[in-house]
């Protein structure tokens, strides 16, 4: 039967539709495999797909994160700095040894012994309340080549917990770390994600806040393996690396707290003693007068009206850089804490300081802030003192504002202040020391006159030579570690306050004369020292005492040798007592001692007073040679109209004020030592008038640009050696001062007379 027309039309349409579906399916599959069709021309009208803009995408992501508050406030201030945080030294043992442990807080990133120096990071930390690190590089610069040492490797690791732990070498490797072979330069790059803070990537700047919110990550550097030298069979003693940080710190939320910019850091070699107190708390004790104890002293603590024992508020991070404290010297069960190499302490206030400064030990920063010291189970722990190198870092300041204690905090930085430089020529300085009488008999000080046969009369066993003139010294005094300082101290009450202006060393002072002595008779005098400074006191217009500071160059013996010192039959050696008021001796209470107030004498001792004792002095030590003589003037160590004394008694109408302190040397009895302070002057007198005139003219030509080659007016081109310095204490220096003020021509004689009339000449 034939098909109907309608059925044929439907079948044809279905067949055509099936062909289109198969065709479309082939095209879809072909486009999915991205196979180019052969013999099919490309469609020029089809647009290419645009590549994504990574910069735009990053910007959109950051904007979205900022909208959702995931990154906190925007950065308001950025500082990029390079800071040295320490050196990596050699390993003394095989096990891991801590070399450096430092927080990355901007107030704490500073060099060892940097004190409270105010750098750009510290300045920013004192002004902003939030901080973070955008990028950081830890640079290891080798200080020795790889061929010179062997046996050690260094590992830097990042500790994000703000507390030490019992970490092995494998445990350090489980952290984010970098291994540095010896002698190789390395750079460790850390990104923001490694250093992000807990407050939407920010850290709090105030270290009085919770430690986990403020101090930031901890960078630790350990060494493994004993460091030995390849050049000789011995341990290596030098440093291996210098470690520097180079990074960018960002800050936000302005909140000024000046004290946070002055947190201190000190490294010192000291004795450390770990112990357990009566309550079972672990304590650390260091010597009271050590630099470390002064650094961690009570000046940072709040003043308390009570004298009861308490614990300070300032927290200190202690790092055992010397690896001198082994776990065996720590009370159980905290041997791991000491072995880890760093911990926290607070000072114990109000306790007796006989045994040293004591501190409570804490195992973490959080424990220190919450007042939970490490407790020991070893109540019978035996204390043991060990010497090591400790690094102490101040982590917080109880007073963060510019309070009254702040100036004292800043002023403290000048101490300890070590001597440097020399007192200027002609400018007075003060000498302070304990003194021991050089010549004495039991409790009586002795002066000696020396009239040995064949020698001039009125001589002494000691003498000082300045230029061409020799002065006889009747005794001397030994100084113990003398100190020299410059100060402006008014002689009378005035509105001008005393001021300290120098702290000098004596060892480099040039000699202005020589000191000779004789200790063995018969014999001749020989040189025993150099004279470097002098002081004087005029008792009357014609009578004076002069003290010369002598640096010993040949050791002084401890005894006088030779029979003439004690067997004084020919009366060649005379012994005297120091200056006293004249008196008439009494034999009973009915006839008391009678003094003559206006008459002083140097009393002669009986010949049988016995062999005197002398005090020895080693090379490099200092003595004071005392000259009792006639003279009417004194300048730069030179005594004008000098004359040796033959008389022993003098009339005194009035006693002048002794502003130089020379009379304090005239003690009536010999103590073991006494404290003495002298006002002295150093100076080099010219050897002749011709030389003086030539030096003055030469200096005038140089300063007034008369000399050849002196055309430059820069002060840097002038010589550091001032020829006038040696003349400032001489009367002729005053001549120059007078000439300098004259406009016209004047003869020298008229200038001298003019100065004398004005009272400038001595």
Swiss-Prot record:
Region (Inner core) location: 67-259
Annotated site residues (Cleavage) in this chain = 305-306, 354-355
- Record has RNA-binding as a keyword: no
Provide a GO CC annotation, any one: T=3 icosahedral viral capsid
* One Pfam family cited in the UniProt record for this chain: Astro_capsid_N
Concerning its family, UniProt says: Belongs to the astroviridae capsid polyprotein family.
Q: What is this protein called?
A: Capsid polyprotein VP86
């Amino acid at each position: 039967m034939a098909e109907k027309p309608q059925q044929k039309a439907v079948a044809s349409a279905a067949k055509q539709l099936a062909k289109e579906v198969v065709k479309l399916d082939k095209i879809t599959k072909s486009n999915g495999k991205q196979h180019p069709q052969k013999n099919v021309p490309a469609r020029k009208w089809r647009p290419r797909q645009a590549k994504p803009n990574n910069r735009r995408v990053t910007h959109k992501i950051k904007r979205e994160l900022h909208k959702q508050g995931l990154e906190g406030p925007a950065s308001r201030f950025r500082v990029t700095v390079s800071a040295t945080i320490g050196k990596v030294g050699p390993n003394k043992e095989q096990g891991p040894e801590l070399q450096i442990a430092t927080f990355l807080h901007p107030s704490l990133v500073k060099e060892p012994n940097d004190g409270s120096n105010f750098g750009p990071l510290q300045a920013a930390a004192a002004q902003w309340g939030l901080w973070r690190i955008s990028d950081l590089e830890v640079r290891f610069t080798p200080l020795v080549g790889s061929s010179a040492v062997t046996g050690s490797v260094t590992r830097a690791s990042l500790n994000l917990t703000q507390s030490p732990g019992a970490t092995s070498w494998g445990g350090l490797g489980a952290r984010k770390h970098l291994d540095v072979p010896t002698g190789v330069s390395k750079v460790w790059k850390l990104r923001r994600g490694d250093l992000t803070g807990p407050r939407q990537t920010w850290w709090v700047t105030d270290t009085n806040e919770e430690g986990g919110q403020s101090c930031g990550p901890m960078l630790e550097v350990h060494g493994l393996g004993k460091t030995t030298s390849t050049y000789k069979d011995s341990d290596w003693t030098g440093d291996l690396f210098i470690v520097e940080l180079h990074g960018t710190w960002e800050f936000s939320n302005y909140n000024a707290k000046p004290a946070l910019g002055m947190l201190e850091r000190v490294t010192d070699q000291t004795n450390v003693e770990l112990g357990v107190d009566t309550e079972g708390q672990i304590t650390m004790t260091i010597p009271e007068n050590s630099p470390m104890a002064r650094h961690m002293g009570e000046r940072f603590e709040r003043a308390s009206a009570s004298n009861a024992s308490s614990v300070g508020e300032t927290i200190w991070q202690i790092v055992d850089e010397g690896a001198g404290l082994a776990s065996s010297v720590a009370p159980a069960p905290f041997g791991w804490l000491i072995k880890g190499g760093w911990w926290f302490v607070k000072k114990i206030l109000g306790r007796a300081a006989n045994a040293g400064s004591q501190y409570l030990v804490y195992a973490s920063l959080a424990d220190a802030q919450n007042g939970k010291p490490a407790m020991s189970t070893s109540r019978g722990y035996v204390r043991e003192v060990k010497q090591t190198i400790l690094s102490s870092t101040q982590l917080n300041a109880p007073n963060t504002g510019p309070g009254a204690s702040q100036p004292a905090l800043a002023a403290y930085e000048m101490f300890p202040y070590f001597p440097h430089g020399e007192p200027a020529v002609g400018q007075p300085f003060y000498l302070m020391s304990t003194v021991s009488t050089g010549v004495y008999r039991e409790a009586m000080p002795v002066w000696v006159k020396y009239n040995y046969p064949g020698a001039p009369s009125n001589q002494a066993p000691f003498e000082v030579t300045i230029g061409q003139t020799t002065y006889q010294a009747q005794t001397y005094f030994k100084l113990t570690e003398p100190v020299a300082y410059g100060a402006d101290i008014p002689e009378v009450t005035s509105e001008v306050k005393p001021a300290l202006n120098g702290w000098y060393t004596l060892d480099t002072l040039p000699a202005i004369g020589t000191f000779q002595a004789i200790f063995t008779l018969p014999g001749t005098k020989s040189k025993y020292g150099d004279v470097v400074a002098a002081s004087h006191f005029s008792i009357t217009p014609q009578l004076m005492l002069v003290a010369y500071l002598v640096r010993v160059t040949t050791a002084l013996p401890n005894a006088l040798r030779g029979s003439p010192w004690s067997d004084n039959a020919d009366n060649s050696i005379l012994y005297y007592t120091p200056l006293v008021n004249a008196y008439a001796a009494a034999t009973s209470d009915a006839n008391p001692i009678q003094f003559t107030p206006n008459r002083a004498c140097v009393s002669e001792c009986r010949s049988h007073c016995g062999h005197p004792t002398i005090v020895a002095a080693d090379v490099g030590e200092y003595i004071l040679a005392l000259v009792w003589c006639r003279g009417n003037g004194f300048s730069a160590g030179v005594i004008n109209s000098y004359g040796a004394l033959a008389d022993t008694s003098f009339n005194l109408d009035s006693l002048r004020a002794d502003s130089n302190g020379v009379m304090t040397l005239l003690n009536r009895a010999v103590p073991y030592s006494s404290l003495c302070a002298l006002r002295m002057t150093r100076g080099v007198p010219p050897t002749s008038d011709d030389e003086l005139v030539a030096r003055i003219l030469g200096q005038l030509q140089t300063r007034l640009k008369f000399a050849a080659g002196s055309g430059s007016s820069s002060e840097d081109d002038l010589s550091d050696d001032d020829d006038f310095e040696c003349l400032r204490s001489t009367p002729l220096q005053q001549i120059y001062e007078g000439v300098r003020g004259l406009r016209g021509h004047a003869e020298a004689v008229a200038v001298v007379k003019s100065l004398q009339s004005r009272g400038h000449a001595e």
